[in-house]
Amino acid sequence: MTFDVKACGARIRELRMKNGLTQETLAEDLNITDVHLRRIESGVRGGSIELLIELADYFHVSLDYLILGRGGRTDEAKEELNRIREQVEHIMRLL
């Protein structure tokens, strides 16, 4: 398994767009230039590990998802766990 800078950039772009953010807004929130963000999203360059951690936190995704495309959104996982927990509690009450 290798790091694909273009795929990572595409995931960042997708997350930004899903959240209705412009490159300028996201860049400002991350305290980087929009040119730097554009280069990351296009796969011209990779982000630093510190920036990737900040992006993962910002978008509530795992670093594993952001870098390698594995896993998913952490908030979706939490929602699924809560649904399962509620189902188990309901079953326990029925017993």
Describe the predicted segments one by one.
Residues 17, 31, 42-44, 71:
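Residue-level detection of the helix-turn-helix DNA-binding "recognition helix"
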Residues 17, 28, 57:
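Alpha-helical residues within the helix-turn-helix
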Residues 20-39:
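Short alpha-helical DNA-recognition segment
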Residues 31, 50-65:
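DNA major-groove recognition helix of helix-turn-helix/homeodomain DNA-binding modules
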Residues 1-18:
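A short, Lys/Arg-rich alpha-helix, primarily the initiator
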